[in-house]
Amino acid sequence: MRRRDFLLSAAAGAAGARWLGPGSAGLSLAHDQAACGPGYASPREAMAGPREKLLYVVALYVGTGVDAPDYLATVDVDPDSPTYSQVVHRLKMPTVGDELHHFGWNACSSCHADSSVSRRYLIIPGQRSSRIHIVDTHDPRGPTLAKVIEPDEVHAKANLSAPHTVHCLADGQVMISMLGDARGRAPGGFLLLDDAFDVAGRWERGATGMQFNYDFWYQPRHNVMVSSEWAAPTTYSGGFNPQDVAAGKYGQRIHFWDWRERKIIHTADLGETGQIPLEVRFHHNPDSTHGFVGAALSSTIWHWHRVGNRWHVEKVIEIPPAELEDWPMPVPALITDLLVSMDDRYLYFSDWLHGDVRQYDIRDPSQPRLTGRVWCGGLLNRVHPLRERRLVGGPQMLQLSLDGKRLYVTNSLFSSWDNQFYPEMAESGSYLLRIDCDTDHGGMQVNENFFVDFGREPDGPARAHEMRYPGGDCTSDIFA
C-alpha cells in the first residue's frame, strides 16, 4: 500500500487535503496556494507561521504503579480558548508498558517540495516495547490510532530494538534511530519505514566505529548526518550505575556520516569531558555546517562545524557540578535536552539534576553567551517562580515555538531514571509549564498563567515527555 492508498483508507475524502497546523483553519489549501508540501520553504518563513494552538505530549505510566497504557495527550495552548492550559484529549495506546518517549512526523519541511505529502501522521514508538504507533491527526483535537507495527516485525526485518529519534526524510520515508539489536545489545542502527509505514529495513550501510546510538540530525545540502551515543538498552533500561561509565558502557563519541553513502566518515571522541552525548542539533539554516551536542554526564556543550573538508569539534560550555550533603559525589547538572531557535540565535538546554533551564546567545557559535536562566525544580531546591507549587523533578524535554517566544518544558527523563533520582514523581506525576522568552534582548520568565499538572490525570499520575506542535517545531523540521 503506497502513500495515497494509505491516506484514502485512513480517511475517505481527505487524501487530497493538507494539514498545516491549528492556525490554518483546518484542512485547507496551502498558505501559499502553490503546489507545495508540508512545512515551510525556509526558517524565516517558519518563524512567520501561525502561532501554536495545540501541543501533543506523550504521557506514560511505566514505573508509576498504574496499570494503564501510555497515551498521547492533546493540550490546549491557545490563551483565547476556554480550555487553555488543559488536556483536551487522550489517545490511549493498545498495550501496557510501551514507555512512549520520543516521536515525530511522517513529513516536515524537508518534504516541502512534494505536494503529495501532508504533515498528518505522528510516528510514536515505545522505547521499551519497540512497538511503533502511527497516529492520524486528521482531527487535530482528537487524534486516532491508524496502525501499529509490532516489535516482532521490527526484530525480524531489521534486527533492531529500542526506537528513539524520529525524523522524516525528503523522499517520504521515515527514519528512526534504534539503540539496540533485537536482544537489546549495542550498537543498534537506523530503521526505515516506507511511505505506507511498512518496515523497509535498515538505513546504514557502514557503521564502523559506532559503539552506541542515540540521536541524529541531517543537513542534506552538506551531505552530512551527525549521530550521538547513549548506551545499550540492557545497560540504561534498569537505571543508572556510575560503574557502567567506568566500564565503558556509555558513549562519548559523535559520528559524522556521508548522507548519500550512508556510512561514517569521521568520529569525534569527546573524552572524559564529553561523556554521554545525547541530543544533536544543526543550525536550521540549511547552508550552515554549525551544530551542537550536549554531553549529559559531563554537563558540557560541544560545537561543531566544517573547516575545509574536516569537521572541527570544540567544547564551548561547561556547567560545574554542585555539592550536596546527601550525595556521595558532586552532582552533575546533567544536560538532557537542548534546542536551537528557528533563527539560529539562541540555544536552550535543560539541567535535569540541578533544575535550571538556560538560554545562550549563539550568534558566535564558538563563544555562547548566557542571556537567561530560570529554575524549574531540581535537586538544588532553588527558588522558582511557581512558589505555590512544588515542582517535583527537574526540567527535561523542551519545545520552542516557531517564533522563538514560548518554550514549553516537561520533567520526565526515563521511567527507571525518574524513579532513581526523583522517586516522588511516580506519585506526583509530571508538570508541563511555559517559559516566555525575550527574543530581542535575551532573558526568560516562567509564565504563571500556564501549568498542566499530569498528577491529576484520570487514570492516575502520569509522566510527560516529548512535545510536538501540529504545525511543526524547532526539533522536527529540517530544511533541505
Briefly describe each language-model feature range.
Residues V58-D98, S115, I124-V148, G206-N213, W217-Y360:
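Beta-propeller domains
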Residues V58-V66, S116-R119, S177-A186, W230-K249, ...:
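Short, conserved, GDST-rich strand-edge loop motifs in beta-rich repeat architectures
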Residues V88-H101, V148-A158, E204-G209, H266-T273, ...:
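Surface-exposed loop and turn segments in beta-propeller and other repeat-based domains
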Residues H138-W217:
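Asp-box/WD-like beta-propeller blade repeats and closely related beta-sheet repeat scaffolds
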Residues D5-L27:
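N-terminal export signals
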Residues A34-R51, H102-S118, A162-A170, W217-R221, ...:
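Structural signature of eukaryotic scaffold interfaces centered on beta-propeller domains
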Residues V75-P82, V135-P143, H303-E314, Y360-T371, ...:
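Short loop/turn segments immediately following beta-strands, especially the blade-tip
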